[in-house]
């Protein structure tokens, strides 16, 4: 048996009682921190609360050598822990499919997800979100050219044209660290400067930091202003809204400090 258990958003206490029960009954417990990380805890605190030894898996362990440890689930109870909800990442869906191919039964214990948290924190309506996207850190190519991905810009543009909000995840890089809202705004404006399509001009954005923690920060403002706003430590995420419903606009003003001018000319 392989149980996928979502840990929630921030620390070791976010796990559900069902998830905790699965861990207590497990023969082996694994966790991966590369698709998402709980900023409010560490492995030692998790093992202390869960009263179980936890083995950390690398990206290679999960994506390239999963069969090496999945085989344990053929004749014992194995728990695989992930930040957030357990099936939001395509990587975890693929892992479940590989387990199925090996004849291993799987169960899911869901956890709080950033996808729902950003709606609750900002007041934006969850059914109005389109395709999400990740802004990667720029890098220098082998030819010495700075490469900035245009994909986030295009995704946001397409969603806006369809009347849909965009959840923009920010890159986590072992060398460059956690991307901030400020860096993300700078990148979007840089691409705007190159393309000149006006997508990011006078565009409202919502920056969210440390969702699920005791002290989350939510700030809505125009991209140029949000670029200079300090939201504190990681993890950060951005939402680029499309045309707002009145209740959404009111929520952004009252809950996220958006400029009151966004309430004008909204039905």
UniProtKB/Swiss-Prot annotation:
One GO process term, biological-process aspect: methylation
Pathways involved: Protein modification; peptidyl-diphthamide biosynthesis
Keywords: Methyltransferase, S-adenosyl-L-methionine, Transferase
Enzyme class label: transferase
Binding site for S-adenosyl-L-methionine: 9, 85, 88, 113-114, 170, 211, 236
EC number: 2.1.1.98
Single Gene Ontology MF annotation: diphthine synthase activity
Coiled coil: none
Signal peptide annotation: none
Catalyses which reaction(s): 2-[(3S)-amino-3-carboxypropyl]-L-histidyl-[translation elongation factor 2] + 3 S-adenosyl-L-methionine = diphthine-[translation elongation factor 2] + 3 S-adenosyl-L-homocysteine + 3 H(+)
Record has S-adenosyl-L-methionine as a keyword: yes
Quaternary structure and interacting proteins, as annotated: Homodimer.
Function in brief: S-adenosyl-L-methionine-dependent methyltransferase that catalyzes the trimethylation of the amino group of the modified target histidine residue in translation elongation factor 2 (EF-2), to form an intermediate called diphthine. The three successive methylation reactions represent the second step of diphthamide biosynthesis.
NCBIfam families on file: dph5
Family statement drawn from the similarity comment of this UniProt entry: Belongs to the diphthine synthase family.
Record protein name field: Diphthine synthase
Species per Swiss-Prot/TrEMBL record: Methanococcoides burtonii (strain DSM 6242 / NBRC 107633 / OCM 468 / ACE-M)
Gene giving rise to this polypeptide: dphB
